Amino acid sequence: METKTAKILDGKTLAEKIQKELTAQIIDAQAKIGRPPGLAVLMVGDNPASAAYVRNKEKSCAKVGIASFGKHFPQETTQTELEDVIAALNQDEQVDGILVQLPLPEHLDAVKLLHQIEPDKDADGLHPVNLGRLVRGEKGLRSCTPAGVMRLLAEYEISLRGKQAVVVGRSILVGKPMALMLLEADATVTIAHSRSQDLKSITQNADILIAAAGLPGLITADMVKPGAVVVDVGINRVSDAHGKSRLVGDINFASIAGVAEYITPVPGGIGPMTVALLLQNTVTSYLQTAKESGALDVK
């Protein structure tokens, strides 16, 4: 008897496709605007994982033609110092996107810092104004990870209209904006979280299951409806018996691949899409600013 295996939603390949599209857009626009798009990434301290993420973003920027303004601050940098830097970047005409790399040292207020970013330069799509635009169904910069999920589902022509969608996780980074974007696409949405009772009975009803709780292996095969679309947003670093670390998601990939219709891997699923949508947000801001200034014809 042939064993069924889920089709892979390949975020890495789609991210490369998006990067090529952005490169072409930038080449065309830069000839008229006279400068490339610019992304400022602010990092505080020496968290190795954060440093790796920042390097990856800078490398991706270079690949598509975005100027990267990396700013690395010592661990003891104060809230006021960072707010002053953000205020200057808000006024800098070379900068179209601003990103604060999380997590920050405990003495810093990340939410307050994010609020200082000019909404139209909010590359991560986390400013209250942009989240408010999402709630109202208005145009605005969208949170990168959930926007990446939506783009990946669209690429594979997975219909969401009328489907039962379950989001496991309620963070402002992923869970809440993810639920709103699914609602925008006419899905019927349930949000589950750490306080939800009988999580299994909730997830078993999902046609579309988004795991975004940050808990390795939380979702197992018996929690998944046969033929479901399972998207793993979790990025968790775990160590094996030999102390070697690796990245895993929130789902048990091997077992769920035998139940689901579509599945995303970790790594290579949503991670590359998050970076691609960060670049896209930066280019969107770049083009919008140019149109408003008259450097580009409004189309």
Swiss-Prot record:
Q: Which GO terms describe its molecular function?
A: methenyltetrahydrofolate cyclohydrolase activity; methylenetetrahydrofolate dehydrogenase (NADP+) activity
Q: Which family does it belong to?
A: Belongs to the tetrahydrofolate dehydrogenase/cyclohydrolase family.
Return the PROSITE patterns for the record: THF_DHG_CYH_2
- According to its UniProt record, which reaction does this protein catalyse? (6R)-5,10-methylene-5,6,7,8-tetrahydrofolate + NADP(+) = (6R)-5,10-methenyltetrahydrofolate + NADPH; (6R)-5,10-methenyltetrahydrofolate + H2O = (6R)-10-formyltetrahydrofolate + H(+)
* Entry EC no(s): 1.5.1.5, 3.5.4.9
What's the source species for this entry? Answer: Nostoc sp. (strain PCC 7120 / SAG 25.82 / UTEX 2576)
Matches recorded under NCBIfam families: PRK10792.1, PRK14186.1
Any transmembrane segments, and where?
Answer: none
What name goes with this protein?
Answer: Bifunctional protein FolD
Q: Which GO terms describe its cellular component?
A: cytosol
Biochemical pathway: One-carbon metabolism; tetrahydrofolate interconversion
Q: What does this protein do?
A: Catalyzes the oxidation of 5,10-methylenetetrahydrofolate to 5,10-methenyltetrahydrofolate and then the hydrolysis of 5,10-methenyltetrahydrofolate to 10-formyltetrahydrofolate.
- Which residues are involved in binding NADP(+)? G169, R170, S171, S194, I235
Q: Does the keyword Ribonucleoprotein apply?
A: no
Which UniProt key words apply to this protein? Amino-acid biosynthesis, Histidine biosynthesis, Hydrolase, Methionine biosynthesis, Multifunctional enzyme, NADP, One-carbon metabolism, Oxidoreductase, Purine biosynthesis
